[in-house]
Structures are given as structure tokens and as C-alpha cells.
A protein has these predicted regions:
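N-terminal "arm"/small-domain region of PLP-dependent enzymes with the aminotransferase-like
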Residues: 1-51, 65-68
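Active-site C-terminal subdomain of aminotransferase-like
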Residues: 217-308, 312, 376
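Conserved active-site segment immediately N-terminal to the catalytic lysine
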Residues: 205-217, 227
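Active-site phosphate-binding strand-loop segment of PLP-dependent enzymes
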Residues: 133-198, 211
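PLP-dependent enzyme catalytic core of the Aspartate aminotransferase-like
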Residues: 6, 10-19, 362-412
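PLP-dependent aminotransferase-like
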Residues: 82, 92-156
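Conserved C-terminal alpha-helix-loop-beta "cap" of PLP-dependent enzymes
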Residues: 311-383
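Conserved N-terminal alpha-helix of the aminotransferase class I/II PLP-enzyme fold
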Residues: 38-83, 108, 112-114
Length: 412
């Protein structure tokens, strides 16, 4: 008796399904879909092969390309950090890299590199205080220093955070463009972490970004379920000659999965969070209908008003003027119950505890963090500011001040 062929012949992707459908078992999952007898899902989850989910993937890809002006859009299941590691394991293997470290979450690049022994060499340029005293604000490494270091070291890849969540710092467009021009001049690529950017979406073409990493839960008001990785023309060209050092986080493979969906079919690498991605698609479409420019303006205005509120109360910002992010406000404190967020919890607010920067800040560095993400906050700015003001009135009654909702002055 002849033995069965092993390994079996696998289908060629993308697989294009016929148009014929029939009612699914549960109307709230896939009402026009097929009865579920695959080996991947049950009737309670949307199948990745379904016509419905194929539309979800195409819609997400289209919106990501539209907003970021990207050549390619890739979804990597997991979270934003999975996307960071996928990028590192795709483009930084045995390469020379340079990291602009503005705090704990750009220190994460170094943690990923060290854990996986990924690059051949890593240079780090840290944020630093702009003055004396333990409450002096921080600014990123001067752009002249960054450009000089790139020309000297000639890194293959430069990694930077658009918004650093640990200190509430944002890189201006001109800063990013200067980094991009410098690394492109030495033949390298520019990778930008936009996971904490909120609605301050970056134009990859204008800012010269080659790889942009984002996630659903901050800028897109979605449930965390994946990383979004956008590629420029240069990155899309170069990825074909790279090999990932990860199976689950193989960025090129996940790119091929998305391209299969874009071609009108589907493909499989690992199980995707189909229901969470469906909800993400819905809120992305909601944001598009409302207007991307309008949402971005709301993000900036909300950040300005909250920073003005804090400034009026004498609460010092960790980020220096000119680098203050509108989506994350991080402030100094000497009160351990504010640093831990305990006092805000007592007022019904879930804020975030302060974290170190890994930028030589010293042992007396104490902060607390306030996130200003999501359509509910952005569409209701005065209500959002009012919630914070009421909590501060009770937490810091001696420092209570009249309503301060005018935008803080920003340097030119």
C-alpha cells in the first residue's frame, strides 16, 4: 500500500473564495457567512477566511495607508511591543543601530536588542535635563548631536520614539526630518515608534520615516490586539532581502498575509484576533467619517488645555517646552501617593504611575502620568479637563486655582 505524501501539498496563497455564502449560525458574528466547521474557530468567532474578515483587513490596510501615507501596512498579532520586536528581528540582525532614547519605552529597543542578541552594535543617544535641579525638564538629544552621530557611526537603522510615554515628550516634525535625511545619506533606514502618538498621526513621506510602528488602543480607540507596522517604498523594497529571526513575529510573513488579503483572498501564518480587528475597523471608519484633521486638532487642543491646567497649579512638566506631547502629560511630584496613582484612584480616575527614564535621571526622579487618548476624551474636551480639574481640587486643595483651560504657550 502506498504511503500518503508527507509533508502534504499546501494550497497556494492567496486563496480566493467563491462568492457563494449562506447564513451563519449566530447572526451577530457573521450573519451572511458560512457554517463554522474549520479547525481554527468556533461559531462564536469570525473566521479569518470569511468574506467579512477579508473586508475588515482591506479596510484597515486602506485607512492606515491613507493616514500615514505608507506604501504597505502590516498587522502583527499581539501588541505594539510585538511590532517593535518584529521590526528589530527583520531589519536589525547583525546590523549597526542607533537609538534615540527619550525614556523607558524607547529603552525597550535596547531590551529587545539585548534579549535577542540582535544587532552587531548599538549606539544610544539619551534625553537630558535642560537645567539644574531635580525638577528640571528633559529634552531629547540635540538634533545637531544626533545628525553628527549618524554621520560618524553610519548606522544601518535609527530607532526613535515619536512620543515617549514615560516623560510625555514628542519629537517635532523638523527633528524627525533631520534624522531621516541624515540616516538616508549614509544608506540607512529610519524606524519610528508611534504607539503612544495618539491622534498626532505622522506623515511618513513628509517626515522621511521608513518603518512606523503603531497599535490600536491609543491613536485608534481600539482594543489592544496587534501591532500596526507601516512601510515606506524603501522599506518595502528592502524587506524582501531580509530574513527574520522570529517565527511568530516574522514581519515579512505578516506583510505577505496582508498582501494576500489585499489581493482578494486570504492566507494563514498564525491565528489572528479577528473579532478585535473587526471592532478596530469600525472605530477607524468612525474616525474617518468624523475627520482625521479634526480629531488631530482636538488632540492638540486637549493636550494644551490640560498642560495649562497643570501649569497654573505649579505642577512642573517633565518634558521641556517645544517637546511637550499633547496625548501624554507627565509631571513631577514629591507625593508617593500621587506617583503611584493612589490619590487619583480615590477620585475615580485611573492614571498611570511614574516610571524611570533610563536617561541618567537619578534616584530622586518621581513623576505621575496622565493619558489623553480616545475619541470620548477628544470629542468632549471641556468635560475631560473638568474631570481632571475636579480631581486636582480634591487632591491638591491648597494649590487649587481658577479654571485654566487656555492653551499653554508653545515656543516657535
Amino acid at each position: 500500500m502506498a504511503l500518503a505524501q508527507w509533508p502534504p501539498t499546501l494550497p497556494k496563497w492567496p486563496i480566493v473564495q467563491p462568492e457563494k455564502t449562506m447564513p451563519g449560525l449566530l447572526p451577530h458574528v457573521d450573519p451572511n457567512g458560512l457554517l463554522e466547521f474549520s479547525v481554527v474557530y468556533t461559531d462564536r468567532a469570525l473566521n479569518h477566511m470569511s468574506q467579512s474578515f477579508q473586508g475588515v483587513m482591506r479596510d484597515i490596510s486602506g485607512i492606515l495607508k491613507e493616514v500615514y501615507h505608507a506604501r504597505s501596512a502590516v498587522l502583527v498579532p499581539g501588541s505594539g511591543t510585538f511590532g517593535m520586536e518584529a521590526v528589530a528581528r527583520q531589519f536589525a540582525n547583525d546590523k549597526k543601530v542607533l537609538v534615540i532614547r527619550n525614556g523607558w519605552f524607547s529603552y525597550r529597543w535596547t531590551q529587545i536588542f539585548d534579549m535577542g542578541r540582535i544587532p552587531a552594535e548599538s549606539i544610544v543617544l539619551k534625553a537630558r535635563r535642560t537645567g539644574e535641579g531635580h525638577h528640571a525638564p528633559f529634552a531629547p538629544a540635540p538634533i545637531e548631536e544626533v545628525v553628527a552621530a549618524i554621520h560618524t557611526h553610519k548606522p544601518d537603522v535609527v530607532f526613535a520614539p515619536h512620543v515617549e510615554t514615560s516623560c510625555g515628550m514628542i519629537l517635532p516634525d523638523a527633528y524627525m526630518r533631520a534624522v531621516a535625511d541624515a540616516v538616508h545619506a549614509v544608506g540607512g533606514m529610519f524606524v519610528l515608534d508611534c504607539i503612544a502618538s495618539g491622534a498626532m498621526w505622522v506623515d511618513m513621506v513628509e517626515c522621511g520615516v521608513d518603518v512606523l510602528v503603531s497599535a490600536p488602543q491609543k491613536g485608534w480607540s481600539g482594543s489592544p490586539c496587534c501591532a500596526m507596522v507601516m512601510l515606506s517604498e524603501l522599506a518595502r523594497t528592502r524587506i524582501d532581502s531580509t530574513t527574520s529571526s522570529s517565527f511568530a513575529c516574522d514581519l515579512r510573513k505578516w506583510m505577505q498575509i496582508m498582501e494576500a488579503y489585499e489581493a482578494g483572498g486570504h492566507a494563514y501564518h498564525a491565528t489572528m484576533p479577528t473579532d478585535a480587528l473587526t471592532r478596530l475597523r469600525e472605530v477607524m471608519q468612525e474616525t474617518r467619517r468624523y475627520g482625521f484633521a479634526k480629531v488631530r486638532a482636538e488632540q492638540q487642543l486637549l493636550g494644551d488645555k490640560v498642560r495649562a491646567l497643570f501649569q497654573a497649579r505649579g505642577i512642573p512638566s517633565v518634558a521641556a517646552p517645544g517637546f511637550q506631547a499633547p496625548g501624554v502629560v507627565v509631571s513631577y511630584t514629591e507625593d508617593p501617593d500621587i506617583q503611584s496613582s493612589k490619590k487619583f484612584l480615590g477620585q475615580g480616575l485611573q492614571t498611570a504611575a511614574g516610571v524611570p527614564l533610563q536617561c541618567d535621571e537619578g534616584p530622586d526622579f518621581k513623576t505621575f502620568r496622565v493619558g489623553l487618548f480616545g475619541l470620548e476624551k477628544l470629542h468632549n474636551i471641556d468635560r475631560t479637563v473638568g474631570h481632571l480639574q475636579a480631581a486636582l481640587d480634591r487632591i491638591m486643595p491648597a494649590q487649587a486655582a481658577p479654571s485654566a483651560v487656555q492653551p499653554a504657550a508653545q515656543p516657535a
